[in-house]
Amino acid sequence: HRLMLEKADEILVGVQILMKAAKVTKGYIGIENNKPDAIKLMTEKAAAYPGIEIVPLKVKYPQGGEKQLIDAVIGRQVPAPPAIPINVGAVVQNVGTAYAVYEAVQKNKPLFERIVTVTGKSLKNPSNFLTRMGTPMSQLIEAAGGLPEDTGKVIGGGPMMGKALANTEVPICKGSSGVLIMNDKEARRAEPQPCIRCAKCVSACPMGLEPFLLATCSAHGDWERVEHEMIMSCIECGSCQFTCPSHRPMLDYIRLGKGKVGGIIRARNAKK
């Protein structure tokens, strides 16, 4: 959000470079409606860049997923893996990548820094930092006011798809987007209960999967069944776990299953 407000022209130039590399004449920048200032600014700026259109999007999670973006912006659906966006004539990049492309091409600047958001209810000074790769997350947390006393977990990434960190000395890398500090109350997990077959997770899944089945089969090591049930199509958005009234750790089990099935598929392909 801040990048679009402060580096709009640079992002648009980066998009033009990406369009030229992909040999396309049309580019879209999708922005959710809860960022009206960014939509207004980018729309005004984009008028000077032929072929680039700003598309306001409905606010819903996970709207930022590449398959969801392609469907929302150009109405094309990406088939199940191994299909990728290029199979439907699309390439998806985020504005951070577009800005990095601009700096690499126009300024001959390698990717050695990126914007990282440090936030949390108990933080004294939640901020966005321009951070060099390799910087320990502890330094960013100190710059944001230090680790609060009621810290329960430190999450690398966002609240839905992020992963808990064992310690704060984990370095920033090119894929780091943010650091979330959760207090004790937020970090506390409810005791998991048996699945009640309510199907809320099925309704919440943006990929049309059956998360309760994937989680149960993964917990029992039934890798053949979870592969058949398209576990590799899961985008790990966490919607299933968030909606589960039984507080089952479905995403944890599904990530385990994806890792196992991915290994099985690679071994199978290596034999061909």
Model-derived segments and their meaning:
Residues H1-I74, R197, I231-M232, E236-Q241, ...:
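Iron-sulfur-cluster electron-transfer modules
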Residues K58-K60, M160, D184-K185, H220:
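Short, solvent-exposed coil/turn elements at secondary-structure transition points
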Residues L12, Q16, I39, T43, ...:
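Predominant activation on well-ordered alpha-helical scaffold segments within soluble catalytic domains
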Residues H1-I11, Y99, V105-P194, C198-V202, ...:
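Conserved mixed alpha/beta catalytic, RNA-binding, or beta-rich assembly cores of soluble enzyme
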Residues K23-M137, A143-P148, G158:
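Hydrophobic alpha-helical positions that pack around
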Residues G30-E32, V55-L57, T119-K121, R132, ...:
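Generic beta-strand/beta-sheet core signal
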Residues S176-P192, V202, P206-K272:
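Ferredoxin-type iron-sulfur electron-transfer modules in oxidoreductases and energy-metabolism complexes
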Residues L3-E10, G30-N34, G89-T97, N128-R132, ...:
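Catalytic cores of large soluble enzymes that bind and process phosphate-bearing ligands
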